[in-house]
Amino acid sequence: MVATVTYIVRLSALSDADAVSALLAASYSTLLASHYEKALLDRALPFMTKANPTLLASGAFYVAQSSHGELIGCGGWSLERPGTAKIVRGEAHIRHFATHPGWTRLGIARSIMNRCCMDAKARDVSELHCCSTFAAENFYKALGFKTVAGAHIPLASQVSFPAVLMQQALP
């Protein structure tokens, strides 16, 4: 018999910051380890695993919360391109997706993405863009995203993180 997975997807709040940071750290340190060198992760993860207060309060960032109250997934979207205030009409950007390593492959990230797509479409978004880690590229492909190009994302003056730029047209 398969156990039932019970969780809700809700809007994040600023009070979720510590739990989201812990979730990002648990997820990225485990799930990225087989795709990136340890030395790179040691330099990059401190920048990548801190919850973004602007995203948390945006009304477009979501958390999956288990029936026991723990945060087991997160992710969202923004109209602004990451790292800028630039907005391109009809375009949105997928932001800070993660699933706790003990809860992967249960549809949690897909549930959050479905919520992102629904809410983005309600804001007249027709195309989603994301900057995927190598570990998440197949997840995004399974959701209909196409690979556009490789990229190196600057995280600090001495830290650049290899990634994959992807996009998807919303139906």
Feature map (PLM): residue ranges:
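Conserved short alpha-helix immediately C-terminal to the canonical SAM/SAH-binding motif I
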Residues: 112, 136-139
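Alpha-helix N-cap/helix-start capping motif
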Residues: 14, 133-134
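Acetyl-CoA-dependent GNAT
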Residues: 7, 11-15, 22-102, 113-115, ...
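Conserved catalytic-core motifs of GNAT/GCN5-like acyltransferases
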Residues: 129-131, 146-165
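Conserved GNAT acetyl-CoA-binding A-motif
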Residues: 113, 120-133
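Conserved G/P- and acidic residue-centered "switch" motifs that form tight phosphate/ATP-binding loops
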Residues: 107
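Conserved active-site tyrosine of GNAT-family acetyltransferases
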Residues: 140, 145
